[in-house]
Each structure stands twice: as C-alpha cells, then as structure tokens.
C-alpha cells in the first residue's frame, strides 16, 4: 500500500509553492507583518484563489473541484513553508467540510455558490 501523495496532489502542491516562492518572499511577508501594504496581501490572496485552492473541497456538482482532504493538507504544507499570511484553513477547508457534511441540498447550493 502506498502512503505518499499522488502525482496530482504533488502537482497542486508544487504550483502553490512556486507561486508563493515567486510572489511572497520573506521581505514581502515582513512588510505585511509590519502592517503595511494591505494591497500586497490582497494580491497574494487573489493569486491563491486563481490557483483554485478556494474550490478544492467543494463538490463538483456545486462548482468546485471535488478533491479530498489530502489535497488540502498538501496545500497547507506549501502555505506553512512560506509563512503565508493568508486565510486558508477556516474558509477553504473547515467551512466547505462543514457545509458538505452538515447542510441540506438547498443550503449547499446557496453557500457553495458564494464561495
């Protein structure tokens, strides 16, 4: 039995890492930590959204990618390695998981559409 990441998971993880390496070097992170350059933080957030991480756990029938939690973990590793000051676990992991398992179909349609 194989206990590593799949090729797709590694590909997704590498894309997030490459983006963050290019767009969020330590000097940029320091500027954000100092409370300056909110626009840089917003641009970083938009960049990871463009990579699709906001949709990884949303089911395909609701417009998401329908991936599993191991994809979320792989992405989390990349974000943590960069010390990226970005929202991730709450809005893109916990919220979709709670909605997926606790909402009825009408609620899923409504909430996932807004994500």
Predicted regions and their residues:
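Glycine-rich flavin
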Residues: 24-115
